[in-house]
């Protein structure tokens, strides 16, 4: 997966890895205003669980991809194609990623509002 993505994204540590690796999206954010959060939210529109964001803290705009050892080659190839599509979207239509996810039940929440005014209980609907 790392080898398929390193032509598109900057790999933070270009070393042999067992299964996890870290991408730095610092250049993508600087040149196209697309953050690691935007790419992670874009993953949701393709049915992929977003990777770990902003960790490790020493890598700017970090995305840590760590597929499990049970993933098939086909699913890893599919994930690579999705990350490549997200990269191309970042270059050609960054606003689409700023609004992602758009195909999910819940779209992108206002994270500042959620942090400042958390709703800590769930109101169940009466059947």
Q: Across the structure, where does each feature detected by a protein language model lie?
A:
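Non-catalytic terminal extensions of PLP-dependent enzymes
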Residues: 1-127
